[in-house]
């Protein structure tokens, strides 16, 4: 049993003993709700406000309740307890508890941090889902890093998770893509044509047209335009998706499924719309079909089918949510750009009308990213004169730095991305600082091996040799990693893992400066090698959640 859960049981047993002794009245006491790690070491290793929680039931002052609880706690798990303020109980772990936790970490090895796969929820996380009409930009990059880290975090926390990319391949944007590629293709072959005003004017479209010419030359010129556009629609979409998948793979982002919007047509879309019509939520006006979202607080009803018969984006989304639910997912998480905020009430309305619970659909909004170079905003790419792409960012700062920086901030806050800091090979750069801790550990392993030291028999290692404060602080930090994973997953907050990894690396660097591993008593060497082995396991686990590599040399 984890220390935190064991402490909760100890507290509740002490309360029951106080009840039995008549010091607390009998009543319906709720389980301990909060047992947290204090921000300052002087307040112990764990702290609870249980006495305050039970004050109303006991009809006593929280401090008096705390005194009764402490009186009936006799547990070797803790070395001492203190009552603070109005009734907080602070617990200081016994040294034997700390040593036992170190053994637990070493026993679990690389899987330490993985929680039991006993969660009932089956979760589908959909993220990025950018239109496949051009390269991914830094806004997409932020969503990609955060989304994949969230998937990794939920899996580590024991959830059944499925990652999906929704490919928008059914709308007018694909027709505009084909028209734009067609225009560039003809231009490159000497024809005087313009890219349509509603087309795509990016440099990448020229690249796609060039690749067509490189492969097929002018073979498509002999086709009539309708046939050529049909081919270009397929070829351009395939090429754009291929580039997009390559960029994401190089960014350590993978999906379990690439879901085609076209697959929803016609049956699943028709079924959803028929249900809405039958129940009176979808109505016809001015030749178009409207969903009555004002019934759920929207400022106006929304068009689903235009008067010309063309479906809106909203139309396929109405069918996509039931599709997810019917595949067995009872929790849906989407990551959208902040500009989609007004879309939330629409999709939640459609869910409610179709008989689904909107509370099962979590929508996380990501705010914009500002790239900074020399302290100044970077507006455009020097190469293309357009928005900076994910590929360009990876080429300049690397995947690891980009992912860590994106994962270290909450999605709902605007972010300044300091390119100069991300490129630094020093402790000023947080990802370098963390990776360097891992590299240092491997360097220590190499030195120990070269010195002929054998280690790894943890059952026979005497960890009571670890008496320095910096050593015990490391173990205590690692002991609460499980709690961190559980809490961060529930909060959908991979940034907490990023912060934890940085703090653990800091504790290790302090230990490295203060404690020698070689050239000391053999038992101390063995114990410290066990300690840094545990640190290495936890650091690598945390970095893997963030999608950041753990190089052995730097």
Regions found by a protein language model. Give the residues of each.
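Short, charged, solvent-exposed linker or helix-capping segments at domain edges/interfaces
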Residues: 100-105
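Non-catalytic interaction-recognition regions
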Residues: 1-99, 110-554
């Amino acid at each position: 049993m984890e220390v935190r859960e064991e402490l909760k049981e100890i507290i509740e047993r002490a309360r029951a003993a106080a009840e039995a002794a008549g010091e607390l009245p009998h009543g319906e006491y709720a389980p301990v709700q909060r047992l947290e790690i204090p921000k300052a070491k002087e307040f112990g290793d764990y702290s609870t406000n249980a006495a305050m929680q039970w004050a109303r039931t006991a009809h006593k002052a929280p401090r008096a309740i705390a005194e009764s609880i402490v009186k009936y706690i006799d547990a070797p798990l803790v070395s001492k307890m203190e009552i603070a303020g109005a009734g907080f109980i602070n617990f200081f772990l016994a040294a034997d508890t700390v040593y036992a936790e170190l053994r637990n970490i070493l026993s679990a090895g690389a899987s330490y941090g993985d929680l039991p796969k006993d969660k009932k929820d089956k979760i589908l996380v959909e993220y990025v889902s950018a239109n496949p009409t051009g390269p991914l930009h830094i806004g997409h990059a932020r969503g990609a890093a955060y989304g994949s880290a969230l998937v990794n975090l939920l899996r580590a926390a024991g959830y059944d998770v499925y990652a999906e990319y929704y490919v928008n391949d059914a709308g007018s944007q694909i027709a505009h893509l084909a028209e734009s590629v067609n225009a560039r293709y003809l231009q490159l072959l000497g024809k005087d044509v313009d890219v349509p005003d509603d087309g795509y004017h990016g440099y990448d479209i020229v690249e796609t047209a060039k690749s067509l010419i490189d492969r097929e030359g002018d073979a498509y010129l002999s086709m009539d335009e309708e046939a050529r556009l049909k081919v270009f629609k397929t070829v351009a979409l395939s090429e754009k998706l291929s580039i997009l998948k390559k960029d994401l793979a190089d960014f350590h982002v993978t999906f379990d499924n690439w879901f085609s919007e076209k697959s929803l047509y016609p049956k699943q879309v028709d079924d959803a719309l028929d249900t809405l019509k039958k129940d009176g939520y979808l109505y016809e006006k001015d030749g178009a079909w409207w969903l009555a979202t004002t019934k759920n607080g929207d400022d106006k009803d929304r068009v689903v089918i235009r008067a010309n018969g063309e479906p809106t984006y909203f139309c396929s989304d109405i069918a996509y949510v039931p599709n997810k639910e019917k595949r067995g997912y009872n929790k849906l998480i989407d990551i959208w750009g902040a500009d989609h905020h007004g879309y939330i009430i629409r999709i939640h309305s459609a869910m409610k009308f179709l008989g689904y619970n909107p509370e099962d659909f979590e929508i996380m909004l990501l705010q914009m990213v500002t790239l900074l170079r020399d302290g100044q905003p970077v507006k455009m790419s020097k190469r293309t004169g357009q928005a900076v792409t994910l590929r360009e960012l990876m080429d300049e700062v690397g995947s690891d730095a980009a992912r860590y920086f994106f994962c270290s901030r909450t999605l709902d806050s605007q972010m300044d991305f300091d390119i100069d800091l991300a490129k630094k090979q020093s402790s000023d750069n947080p990802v370098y600082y963390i990776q360097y801790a891992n590299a240092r550990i491997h360097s220590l392993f190499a030195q120990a091996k070269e010195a002929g030291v054998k280690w790894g028999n943890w059952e026979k290692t005497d960890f009571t040799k670890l008496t320095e404060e910096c050593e015990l602080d490391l173990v205590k930090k690692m002991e609460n990693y499980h709690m961190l994973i559980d809490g961060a997953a529930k909060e959908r907050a991979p940034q907490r893992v990023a912060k934890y990894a940085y703090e653990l690396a800091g504790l290790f660097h302090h230990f490295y400066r203060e404690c020698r591993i070689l050239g000391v008593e053999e038992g101390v060497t063995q114990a410290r090698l066990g300690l840094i082995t545990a640190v290495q396991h936890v650091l690598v686990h945390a970095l893997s959640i963030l999608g950041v590599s753990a190089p052995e040399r730097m």
